[in-house]
Amino acid sequence: MTLEAKLRCVRCGYEVSEIKYVDLCPNCGGLLITHSSGPLRRSRNLGVWAWSSNLYASRMRPRITLGEGNTPLIKSLNIGKSIGLTLYLKDESKNPTGSFIDRGSATLATALKYFKIRSVVVPSTGDLSISVSTYLRRVGISSKTYIPSSVTLSKAYKNLLVSDKVRFVDSYEEALLKALKNTQIYGAVVLPNNPFLIDGYRTIAIELVHSIGKEKPLMIVVPIGDGVLALSTHYVLKDLQLQHKILGVRACRESPLLRDIYVTKPILQEYLKELENLGFLEIVNVCDDEALEASEIMVKKEGFLIGPVGASCIAALRKVVRESMRKVVTVALMSGDPLQDPYVIKALLEKTVKPNEQVVTLGFTKIKILETLAYGNQTYPYMLWKELKQKHGLNLSRRSVYKHVEELISLGLLKVVSYEKVGGRVRKVVTITESGLKLLS
């Protein structure tokens, strides 16, 4: 059966034209991305399947959807004018789980069901596993998730709700390693570079071109993450022979506020580097104060209740706007991260956040440490490590837990009440402070 849309290796050009489940290029192990030579034809199908003629997974059944895609493309009335750009805002927070990832989860779930894969393992920083596991619930495929213990509380709870098994580990790198060790146990390991995920991501660029047209060059601003969104956007626009550039946004450092867009070594680094060398990609670093300011501007100038991660694309644009950009149509992607964290909202209201000052947004592990000590308990960090492992399934190293404790002390949320000698070792005894109790309440 000949398909209009084919998987093609970015590295060697090998094409997978028949229907089969593959993770990487069978020829060289490179990245596979869907290429479609056909016109953009929108059908009446729901979700990403409105563009089924341009999707590799289109011949698979049943097609899975939760109504993802077809998200609002809103012309900026004030921010674009203030920086001299023709600016549109693509609101991906309107997807079912609040992330553009839902587009890929629809095509991935369809493929997994079609190929009768019954279980998967997903290493994630939070959003990927929430989206994939949510869609797999519809087709009865079980999922196991590995996520860093530093993930925000809301993402930790969402993962616990939708995944069949969740394991908390020290870092995303450890999550990747543990997931890859499960390849013989689970039917598939879902990594960010999975071609069936990317198949669905492509519909973002397809929708943009369908709405805006092909007359003017495009600049698309996206969070860089692992690189899949930038690459999928580029290859859609390349297939359509459109002049374009991708502005990739990355956090300037790791912080609780922007941890979702802080990636030191993207999985697809070699492909991103090639795009940079060819002039299709420019990466911009955004810091906490810049993202917070952009979030405030989005609320007050455009009526967008979007958090710092979602507003980071606007922060990047404000940093690099130049005369040559005034001749193109610019689209900034707003994905997930609705403005709902009370500490971020408080900071915006009081305007107390200054450069290099952190907003206190705690991850799952730190919240659990505070909760453990919230009832007047005093204990050693070692005992905290044991309780986190036994009661909450946090499979962390002792060093990692001790580091969390030290950070909570530096934030004024824990304090050292005494030192005791146990088994020849001097151990500190810690307890929660009034500030820590207030934060929990």
Model-derived features: where do they sit?
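Short acidic, hydrophobic short linear motifs in intrinsically disordered regions
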Residues: T379-K389
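Active-site-proximal loop->helix
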Residues: S129-K181, P342-A347
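Active-site/ligand-binding-proximal alpha/beta "capping" segment
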Residues: L180-L240, L275, L292-K301
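Positively charged, low-complexity intrinsically disordered leader regions
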Residues: A50-K113
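Active-site/ligand-binding loops adjacent to catalytic centers
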Residues: D170-T183, D239-P308, I345-E357
